[in-house]
Amino acid sequence: MSDAFCSDCKRHTEVVFDHSAGDTVCSECGLVLESHSIDETSEWRTFANESGDNDPVRVGGPTNPLLADGGLTTVISKPNGSSGDFLSSSLGRWQNRGSNPDRGLIVAFKTIATMADRLGLVATIKDRANEIYKRVEDQKSSRGRNQDALLAACLYIACRQEDKPRTVKEICSVANGATKKEIGRAKEYIVKQLGLETGQLVEMGTIHAGDFMRRFCSNLGMTNQTVKAAQESVQKSEEFDIRRSPISIAAAVIYIITQLSDEKKPLRDISVATGVAEGTIRNSYKDLYPHLSKIIPAWYAKEEDLKNLQSP
């Protein structure tokens, strides 16, 4: 339930929404505050079709302000029966021949949604990626570019701007074959185009090593205690001038924390889980090593334990 102002009660009260009638009713006096309202969110139920065709859901998705018609299109389905199949398929062909200026956007948005779902990203990131793609597409300058890389780069930038960054390698894993280099080039192109549009530098958000820590630790199956120690350590590492990328620092901290525990992880496994090369992890470890006594929590490891670590 939500709150709304009731003219009879003369104050805000809890209201109940009657889905069958479309009425919003005051829960205290029963006054209908709004009638015949339309729910624009997508339907939560789906009705399976045994014929193997698409599920015949009764309504489409929610309205989309990025599309010219708000996403409120009509699709001609195939009813049962041979004559019906012939009629509907003919109408369907004519419908497909009709001009739909949003067809390309719809396909792009579906691709972005699929990639985002595979990475477990929230709806706000999908919406931001859609918005970025629409702004670039409106400039009519992306023709001929790798579409998969472009969409993946939109998702990467959206993650950064929503303070939920993903590594390029993570984005690459769901990018339908686009390489890290192609996504990197597409990202630079998008940032340049958006900068030309607004006349300002595009805000990408700041990446911190801690942004990746919990996800990396989860990939390695680390215990809650080691995860906590890793998070505290990586946060403490920001106080020092360690000129390495946040992802490299996160990987090196995980290596150190696991070496101090009974659940030691091979460098190879950490490299696979984080996407950071083994050599890069070693170099980051070398930079962190002089500061370990101030970075590693005292409750997790004693000074003697730190001295037993391998010298870089």
Swiss-Prot record:
Gene Ontology CC terms: cytoplasm; nucleus
SMART domains: CYCLIN
Sequence repeat residue intervals: 115-192, 216-290
First and last residues of each zinc finger (TFIIB-type): 2-34
Gene Ontology BP, a term: transcription preinitiation complex assembly
Domain of life of the organism encoding this protein: Eukaryota
Pfam families per record: TFIIB, Zn_Ribbon_TF
Molecular function in Gene Ontology: TBP-class protein binding; zinc ion binding
InterPro entries referenced in this protein's UniProt entry, alphabetically: Cyclin-like_dom, Cyclin-like_sf, TFIIB, TFIIB_CS, TFIIB_cyclin, Znf_TFIIB
Keywords: Metal-binding, Nucleus, Repeat, Transcription, Transcription regulation, Zinc, Zinc-finger
Compartment list: Nucleus
UniProt binding sites for Zn(2+): C6, C9, C26, C29
Similarity section: Belongs to the TFIIB family.
Subunit structure as annotated in this protein's UniProt entry: Associates with TFIID-IIA (DA complex) to form TFIID-IIA-IIB (DAB-complex) which is then recognized by polymerase II.
Function: General factor that plays a major role in the activation of eukaryotic genes transcribed by RNA polymerase II.
Name of the protein this chain belongs to: Transcription initiation factor IIB-2
Source organism: Arabidopsis thaliana
Gene: TFIIB2
